[in-house]
Each structure stands twice: as structure tokens, then as C-alpha cells.
Amino acid sequence: MKNRQLYKYGLKVYGFEFINGKGRECLEKVVQNDTRRYPLCDEVNLLIRTSYGTLNVVTAPGFMFDGRSGPKIVDWYAPNLGTLEERICWLVHDCNGYGQDLSFEDTNLLLFAMLRDLAGY
């Protein structure tokens, strides 16, 4: 998906697939805490299938993500961790925000599409 313009309404996210069994378990085991910083217990390797191709997201054990960024006041609507699908959205957004191939704008467009198509927002 590098160097492609992702259009807010044209991008579709069809699903995700964990490449290793430990990634799903690792994300499911994360427990919310007051610091809102979550080190992953193992590698997470997953594929995000979109209308623009497939994005492979791989993290190392110990990768730190913060769930949904932003103030606690909106946790009632968009939880800091939430469902597995929401956690995947937050994780992929954090991974792309740390020097991956997508621009900041495209990273946010992918997040919005994932929330719409995977998490039901």
C-alpha cells in the first residue's frame, strides 16, 4: 500500500488473520491499567486485508501500545482497549504511526476504515 492515496470512503477493510497463534492470545490477555501503556507479551503477526491490498503488521515481544489514544472521557464510546477487533485497530494504528510506509493521513484513514468495517463503528 506504500505511496498510494487511500480515500476515506473508497478504502474497504475485509478482515484480518493472525499468522501466529500467540498474537491473538497476546492481544486478548492485555489488561487495562492506569498508565494505559500495554507491553505485548509475544510477537504479533497479522494480515489486514483491504481493497488496496494486504498489510502485514509484525511487532516484537514487548512492543508497547496505548490502546485507543486520547482522553479517558471518551472511553464510554470508544474504549481504551475494547473488543479484539478494536484492539487490532488501535495496534495497527500505533504500528503505522511509528515509521511505517503509510503517511499520517493514510494511517488515520486506515484506522477509520478498520473501525467501520471490523469494529462496527
Go through each PLM region and give its residues:
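Extended terminal accessory/targeting regions
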Residues: 1-121
